[in-house]
Amino acid sequence: MMSALSQAAKSLLLQDFVSAFFLSMRQFFAPKETINYPHEKGPVSPRFRGEHALRRYPNGEERCIACKLCEAICPAQAITIEAGPRRNDGTRRTVRYDIDMVKCIYCGFCQEACPVDAIVEGPNFEFATETREELYYDKDKLLANGDRWERELARNISLDAPYR
């Protein structure tokens, strides 16, 4: 009898409706969690894996030593490297360094395998194109990406260094 009486009082006073209404009002006036994307950008983690880039040393020489570890470890087989002849000092550089971004799965294995931090995945995630051919990155495009993002790439690598 008591439970029926309390149930009737609860429905008569619209307790569920009122509590739901106050919950809605609290959420309505709370700060918004979304951002207006094209005009505002959220924070990007230093470990974010975006558009690929080839880095240079401070003297302007490219870092890649044509060891081909990134090509060997790539599970999608998206990287193609051609090594040039050995130089007088015994080192090699690449003649051709291509990445097919359509095949790439952005796993980051190439970046982890590189002994000289030459190939990195940068902070850029806005690289949509109209044709598939534009997603075939050659060495010049990768070096241009590295030059454009070098300051942020160096900062991200230094922030990630304690965890490597």
Swiss-Prot record:
Cofactor(s) needed: [4Fe-4S] cluster
Cofactor note: Binds 2 [4Fe-4S] clusters per subunit.
Enzyme Commission code: 7.1.1.-
Subcellular location as annotated: Cell inner membrane
Membrane topology category: Peripheral membrane protein
Chain positions recorded as [4Fe-4S] cluster 1 binding sites: 64, 67, 70, 114
NCBIfam families given in the database record: NuoI, PRK05888.1-4, PRK05888.1-5
Protein name: NADH-quinone oxidoreductase subunit I
Source organism of the structure: Mesorhizobium japonicum (strain LMG 29417 / CECT 9101 / MAFF 303099) (Mesorhizobium loti (strain MAFF 303099))
